[in-house]
Amino acid sequence: MNIFGVGLPEVTVILILALLIFGPKKLPELGKQLGKTLKSLKKASNEFQNEIDQVMNEQDKDESPISIESNQTNEINQEKIDSENSKK
């Protein structure tokens, strides 16, 4: 078990220290609160990531027609230059 670079011996020491500091009655309550906090942070992180993805998708949709139009314009301009060069 290796979570965040912390192995089993380190986790055991942390749990023993928490038990000594907070006592057996307070530890389950703290664990419950920690779980709620982590769940809330994960939810906020997912919402933030979804918003970023949505903005990126909207931006891609907005840029696509411009890119296609720019490519077509560049092709037309290149054809004009080629035809002018071939006439000379």
Curated annotation (Swiss-Prot):
Which cellular compartments is it found in?
Cell inner membrane
Q: Per the UniProt entry, what is one GO biological process? A: protein transport by the Tat complex
Q: What is this protein called?
A: Sec-independent protein translocase protein TatA
Q: Give me the disulphide-bonded residues.
A: none
Biased composition, Basic and acidic residues: where in the chain? 77-88
User: Can you list the GO cellular component terms from the UniProt entry?
Assistant: TAT protein transport complex
Domain of life of the organism encoding this protein:
Bacteria
What role does it play? Part of the twin-arginine translocation (Tat) system that transports large folded proteins containing a characteristic twin-arginine motif in their signal peptide across membranes. TatA could form the protein-conducting channel of the Tat system.
Q: Which PANTHER family match?
A: SEC-INDEPENDENT PROTEIN TRANSLOCASE PROTEIN TATA, CHLOROPLASTIC
Q: How does it assemble?
A: Forms a complex with TatC.
Organism of this sequence:
Prochlorococcus marinus (strain AS9601)
Which parts pass through the membrane? 3-23
Q: Which family does it belong to?
A: Belongs to the TatA/E family.
Q: What is its main location?
A: membrane
**Could you tell me the gene encoding this protein?**
tatA
